[in-house]
Amino acid sequence: MLIPSKLSRPVRLDHTVVRERLLAKLSGANNFRLALITSPAGYGKTTLISQWAAGKNDIGWYSLDEGDNQQERFASYLIAAVQQATNGHCAICETMAQKRQYASLTSLFAQLFIELAEWHSPLYLVIDDYHLITNPVIHESMRFFIRHQPENLTLVVLSRNLPQLGIANLRVRDQLLEIGSQQLAFTHQEAKQFFDCRLSSPIEAAESSRICDDVSGWATALQLIALSARQNTHSAHKSARRLAGINASHLSDYLVDEVLDNVDLATRHFLLKSAILRSMNDALINRVTGEENGQMRLEEIERQGLFLQRMDDTGEWFCYHPLFGNFLRQRCQWELAAELPEIHRAAAESWMAQGFPSEAIHHALAAGDALMLRDILLNHAWSLFNHSELSLLEESLKALPWDSLLENPQLVLLQAWLMQSQHRYGEVNTLLARAEHEIKDIREGTMHAEFNALRAQVAINDGNPDEAERLAKLALEELPPGWFYSRIVATSVLGEVLHCKGELTRSLALMQQTEQMARQHDVWHYALWSLIQQSEILFAQGFLQTAWETQEKAFQLINEQHLEQLPMHEFLVRIRAQLLWAWARLDEAEASARSGIEVLSSYQPQQQLQCLAMLIQCSLARGDLDNARSQLNRLENLLGNGKYHSDWISNANKVRVIYWQMTGDKAAAANWLRHTAKPEFANNHFLQGQWRNIARAQILLGEFEPAEIVLEELNENARSLRLMSDLNRNLLLLNQLYWQAGRKSDAQRVLLDALKLANRTGFISHFVIEGEAMAQQLRQLIQLNTLPELEQHRAQRILREINQHHRHKFAHFDENFVERLLNHPEVPELIRTSPLTQREWQVLGLIYSGYSNEQIAGELEVAATTIKTHIRNLYQKLGVAHRQAAVQHAQKLLKMMGYGV
């Protein structure tokens, strides 16, 4: 729950001076991105902005305290303030903030600005006491906020110091409205108005001016002088002389003498006790001070001018002026040290009664009451965990003695889940092992089963499927039906283990069961995870259309539950990119991969490895080797600076080896082959992928025999495990092996098998990536006119894609190539004596690439009759009579120049 007072603009009090000159300056605030009000404590920053905000509707107010350095808490309150200003316009952001379903503050703000794009009225967001923020992540996020906020939004920041918000840049660009302490200082006229409304006996204008000069227009000093004069302890001028030249850091002695020592003991204790509350209402005051009629007492304190502020229009919530509140808290520690723990306990109990466990924890920690802290955690810790209050929980658990954790194993489990969420896998097992060693009878029953479910999740995350399977099975055997969260975890882990083992049918059933349980109990991140796993399994089985439909369900879940910022969203868009790539929808595949990188923009660059590999695949499928090389440089740098799952390494190696194949880089392939991992098995898609990488490198190096052994074994495993997509890929690579080894009939046989299987998988780009060798074979099959209709159609589609993206031979017949060809000692004499024109060389290249006359005309943007003339001329010069002879002649020329065709 959010504390309402933190989102309430302070009420404009009676007897305050209206700062007309400053309000006039603020009237143009909507013309600036940032309005910055800075001064030391007590200069009237909050009072000024509350005057300016009076009557404005499209304004949100966020009052900070020290606890707002937690990113999640900061995000929740800031979005709530925007919702307040827009009357609930940004519903998606609100849900994301409440459920902590965002990757970072910047990504949450990016979503906020998308929603605010439809809000066209002027909008204001006030953040008070920004000097309390010390978290550099929040500073950086707010700099992002200011850079990208909509033009109709003005951010108003109140701070005691200059905040780290890129102020200089805003100032240069005239996007900053500044009001500092010199402007906030009271003028002679304002000081006179102030005393006139505060004192029963007016003072002369000259006296008022001297007092104002003595304290340099400091509003707090003027307030103290008025308070002192009302209490008749000193004359106003005498108080002013005493305050002259001091500042907020030297006020303590003055406040003791002039405030605390001039109230009765009951009021003094009321002030000291109530000051431990960052915000207060009637119920909190009653419990903390022991006085009834807390609301009346607060209103009385307010009337006495003792630096108390109303925080909302209803008058329910109050707080002390920060300067006075800090002073009172310090005095409370000195004067009521013995009572202080009990006061904090009372505050914690009252906050709990009002449904604010995080505030209660703050006071339980301050009281040093481990028993109270334990009880709060036992009742509310999992709710706080699910709302990502991780820093607060970690601090709380550290404050509990180990014996208290042992007496309450649920708290040990919570601490272990905290470690797991931070990827501290080794510490999880150490903690649980220690607990099991010291807790009697823990090795049996429900708690042990919950430990095992968590251990299973850690084991699968850490790449240990056998141990994960053992632990997940134990957990499911021991967990009661009602322990749904741990049952979801264990079922998901078991499904993932079976996926790794290639038992796809059983794995799919368990992941469907996980989805059903997770949806039933609103455990949305596991529901999303199970859908992603289902899609991967269906892809591996060759059911790409069903995989697509499962992905659609996952995207719908993300939209409904606002899970866009979860890292798992990247996993989903990445496997969507893989599917689109397989179907040769390259532009969409690239866009999907780039959106995955955007999801991970606030994470370590190493997390982007998979999406980067997907972008390289798109470049390779287009034949764009320059772009692929540029991206590969970055990929190889990431590989050298991180630890990755074998699936990630396999995908990264795949694009590297394909690139070496396309560029003929045998040295790189040989070096990689010497050092790369040789998996013991090949019973899942990523192990199959790594062995396929090895076979491709062996083929490039001419090591046909070992490559054939690898591929035949892969095919045997793929058939037995029904890894149909892997079988399709393996057949294509085996085709390349046979083609290059001169075993043309074997090459044709496996190519026909691959085309037939592609009717199920829908593969296109996997054929295209093999380039001209594949194009030649497909041209021959099409010319034979013996393919079934579906295979014939697919072969024509693949050939069109190769012709579009892999015009290697057309590229070879450029001016530089022709010049080198004509100077080659073995060039046919006929070409030397009767050379082709540059246009005729281009036409020959397109004929060789499989283009029809109409396609050549379209490519070169000339009439079809012109192309016929060019063809007739080049046939005559080459001494050939038909198209196939021209193709064979071009092939001989390319071989002569050293191109493997």
Swiss-Prot record:
The gene is malT. GO terms for molecular function: ATP binding; DNA binding; DNA-binding transcription factor activity. Positively regulates the transcription of the maltose regulon whose gene products are responsible for uptake and catabolism of malto-oligosaccharides. Specifically binds to the promoter region of its target genes, recognizing a short DNA motif called the MalT box. GO terms for biological process: positive regulation of carbohydrate metabolic process; positive regulation of DNA-templated transcription. This is HTH-type transcriptional regulator MalT. It holds the Pfam family GerE. It comes from the Bacteria. Residues 853-872 bind DNA.
